[in-house]
């Protein structure tokens, strides 16, 4: 991957293809989830496909404490500016749904459209009750991480989201992805998974998003993501839905085409 300096940090990125720009923002934990889309001929042959690793992941500048959603959005904007991209279709997965929506709120002229691949519940849910409802799942996982076993914590989280064979499934389309996730555990648990991060999305913010929006969910995903879709419709009436048959939260990692 290439490197670029933006906002005082170095990010890794890659580009493929030509045409209208599409930027993929990865979710929490697995930095290269955009790879299956970037190499997909149906996309690469018609679009300029851009993917990057957020700060704290892979070979990017390591983080010193939590990174805010706004900072991640600023990083994406700065990357696009460095690549001389005035406008891009923004595709996001899981946690990065917050980043993409913040980007659309802060700099709407940069975002041509939004594709939300099962964004995190924090998009539309109050972090405190949400944290309480997820405690039975996240409690044991965080205990493992705080005990110093980052690999077990990563495995516990993604087994809950992706299923027990997630490492084999991810490796099929993102070679080395699970191993990199183990190395990036500190960024996942010390920044991305901190409840709320003082981030808010409501009617005032939603009114600034007038671009086309697509919400993609999997037919085998947790019911929680269906609830998120319903709640987002109240804020974004222009949003369209699509369901990927046979997919869970892995979505495009399980079915790239």
Which residue stretches match the model-derived regions?
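Conserved HGGG/HGGXW glycine-rich cap/lid loop of the alpha/beta-hydrolase fold
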Residues: 2-65, 79
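Glycine-rich His-Gly loop
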Residues: 24-28, 94, 218
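Conserved serine/cysteine hydrolase catalytic core
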Residues: 178-234, 240-243
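Conserved hydrolase catalytic core segment
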Residues: 86-128
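Acidic beta-to-alpha connecting loop that harbors the catalytic carboxylate
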Residues: 28, 219-221, 246-248
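Conserved alpha/beta-hydrolase catalytic His-Asp/Glu region
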Residues: 148-188
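Catalytic histidine-centered segment of alpha/beta-hydrolase-like enzymes
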Residues: 244-256
